[in-house]
């Protein structure tokens, strides 16, 4: 399973480290917005006015508000830690939308 996470972990870690606002679309169409506070193999903690634990199996798409560089610098492609935690995440307003109109 580490191979499948070699794309996921660097991407999510870059979003967490750089505190990039993200929109997370769930498989049922609901849109969540916030900043990734931390994540592990099964869940993502999304921070806004409240922290929400979002199970990865319920996620369809993660859309950053801006481009991020997520390439891993280590040749192994993995991380030595299975849990990633943001130190002092900022954010406000956990938002939930059934559908987005732009």
From Swiss-Prot:
Provide a GO biological process annotation: regulation of translation, ncRNA-mediated
Q: Spans of biased composition, class Polar residues?
A: 70-96
Could you list this entry's UniProt keywords, alphabetically sorted. RNA-binding, Stress response
Domain (Sm): give its ranges: 9-68
Which cysteine pairs are covalently linked by disulfides here? Answer: none
Family stated for the protein in its record: Belongs to the Hfq family.
Q: What is this protein called?
A: RNA-binding protein Hfq
Species of provenance: Salmonella arizonae (strain ATCC BAA-731 / CDC346-86 / RSK2980)
What is this organism's lineage? Bacteria, Pseudomonadati, Pseudomonadota, Gammaproteobacteria, Enterobacterales
């Amino acid at each position: 399973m580490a191979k499948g996470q070699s794309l996921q972990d660097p991407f999510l870690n870059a979003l967490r480290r750089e505190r990039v606002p993200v929109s997370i679309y769930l498989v049922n169409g609901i849109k969540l917005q916030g900043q990734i506070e931390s994540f592990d193999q099964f869940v993502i903690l999304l921070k806004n006015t409240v922290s929400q634990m979002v199970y990865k199996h319920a996620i369809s798409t993660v859309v950053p508000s801006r481009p991020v560089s997520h390439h891993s610098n280590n040749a192994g492609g993995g991380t030595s830690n299975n849990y990633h935690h943001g130190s002092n995440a900022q954010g406000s307003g956990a938002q939930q939308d059934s559908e987005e109109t732009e």
